[in-house]
Amino acid sequence: MSYCLSEILNNQGVRHREFPVTRDKIFLGHAGVAPLTRAAAQAVQDYAWEITENFQEVGDFFSNLQRTRQLASDLIQAKPEDIALIGPTALGLNLVALGIDWSVGDEVVYYPQDYPSNVYPWSDLRRKGVRPVALKPENPGQITPELVMASLSSKTKLVALSSCHYLTGYRLDYQTIGVELKKRGILFCLDSIQSLGATPIDVQFIDFLSADSHKWLLGPLGAGIFYANPALYDQFHPPLLGSWNVHSPGFVAQEEIRFHSTAQRFEIGSMNGLGIMGMKASLEIISSLGVEAIQSRLIFLHRSLRSKLQSLGWEVLSESYPESALSGIVTVRKWGSDLNEVYKKLTDAGVVVSLRWDANKNPLIRFSPHFYNLESEFDQVISILKG
């Protein structure tokens, strides 16, 4: 099915049909767990019934896997054979942390105020004699190329960052960082869950990427993608082994451990069929609309919502960000206000947002609209906040 952004925005019937959550909710929580689209839910249901009544033909299943790899590879400028269909995001990040051949004294650069899944795999490397080097930006989440470059040394082996900070919404200039790291022969790992489906990504600037589908991709929990630069396969040993990623003819264990030559080497066992079918349907939507158009829409919505919230006296964390750093995340605070009460008021009115806290335990409210949200919904939010 083909999707048209203008039709989604201007035809309420189409919008309600394809994005059922819009029927009775104002959903502004896509940086958390996004609602499934009609297409994704239908794909999951169809697959469930198929394996209930008929058991899907193996050939059909592999055809769907290949189509999913193709869609995902187009989204990140990779090849289909370089896409592993695994989730959640933390699994891919841990594959990197555990698969690199570390030496005592090696350094990994990371941001300790990132989402925990992109912190613990790196800080835990102390057990292997690796030194985690913590980035300390002047403002939370604002990781700049200059900050990253200043943290490097002759012992830096990997830089592990998020393409977009989960709390502040600051979008990383990963391309500039990636170019400089390649010049120095330093590996670059990107947690892209807050960008996949919202922002164009090009893996030529990075070495590893991991992202689940349940946020901006509008897919199910636990279905995601993992990318590793194939040029690194010989020096990057998959740390998890099973019947799927190691050559096992006829499912018979072999004496020699020989990994597949494609990204299948990172898929250790039975595939998440239900999740992958849902993710495939969501990828079809993103592909049809075009991620560049989605990004433009999100920046427009960001500016609109930010302006409306500022008019009520809310402090918006992204108010000084350049446009290149804007995302679909608009996080606010208001000193002296009970944000728990504000969150409850919004929730009771059918507005879905996220209540979060910064490193100093100060409460924040995070809004994260997607392309199908309307400015009129923002006006309703403002009316609720005024009331």
Task: Spell out what each predicted region is.
Residues 1-387:
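Pyridoxal 5′-phosphate
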